[in-house]
Amino acid sequence: MEETSKLQVLKCPACNAKLTYFFEFDQVITCPVCHNRMNSHVLQTVEAHMPLRYVSPTIDVDGFKHLMAQTLVDIDFVPCDVFQAIDAEEVFCIYLPMYLYEGTYQVAWSGIGSDQQQLNGNAKGKLAYLYLANDRKGDLPKELRDFTTCLPYDAEALSSFEAGHIDATDSHVLTTLSTITAEAVWKKWGTKLTDKLAKSTVHDQIGNQKVRKLKISPTVELTNLGEPLFVPFYFSYYTYNNHRYCFIADGQGKHLSYNNPIDKRESSYVRN
């Protein structure tokens, strides 16, 4: 049975972002949205349901920093001085409420081959995806929201959730509230996900054949209708030449999202 816990909510006076923490503390807080530093703050306490399980991280803050540095090093034409703009202290960890959907899908397809022959077939597959359980746009930076809306799920990473596993003294550890039901999330995104998986499976089956008037009819059977989980992510923002850039990774370091500056002079020199 899910337990409830008291979370601390702080509204940033600079950008009005609502920041949610597991614990109350006294040190300086940095807003991950606008980077405003708050020395004094008034926290509001809210009751929230805690999930029974979470995706346990396999990298820590240092691992995230190494992943970010290595990724940028491997990208062509990244300015050499970009690392001077990255503040190693401005790395945030956030445990996002997400819903887990698992099940199987089947798809029947038909079409006309290159020789006018009628073609048809059946395919099936498994699905295991995580969807963000928060639809309130002001709660998260846009880049983080876009990245975490839907992600594949790693079954091996699940553990029982205990708030004691989280560092109560770290102001860079955040969470956010669940604001939408599992049924509403699946109604909003489930059909799109099923259609995408079905099309990919059918195209894999068809291979290089040319098929006209392709019709795809998928059905899905869920064995997990949206189990609530906490899923950790790391993210960092930095400014270079007055432009903001970000680097985001899941707690396993398997899924990344980032943008980065490009040295245009170096890039144009190589092209020429």
Regions of interest found by a model, annotated:
Residues 19, 38:
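Cys/His-rich microdomains that often coordinate metals
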Residues 1-3, 7:
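Intrinsically disordered, low-complexity terminal tails
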Residues 12-15, 31-34:
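Short cysteine-rich clusters marking metal-coordination/redox-active sites
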Residues 4, 41-244, 262-269:
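Charged, low-complexity helical/coil segments in non-catalytic cytosolic or luminal regions
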Residues 21-29:
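Short linker/helix segments within small regulatory modules
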Residues 244-263:
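Juxtamembrane amphipathic/hinge helix adjacent to a transmembrane helix
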Residues 7-9, 28:
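Residues immediately within or flanking Cys/His clusters that coordinate Zn2+
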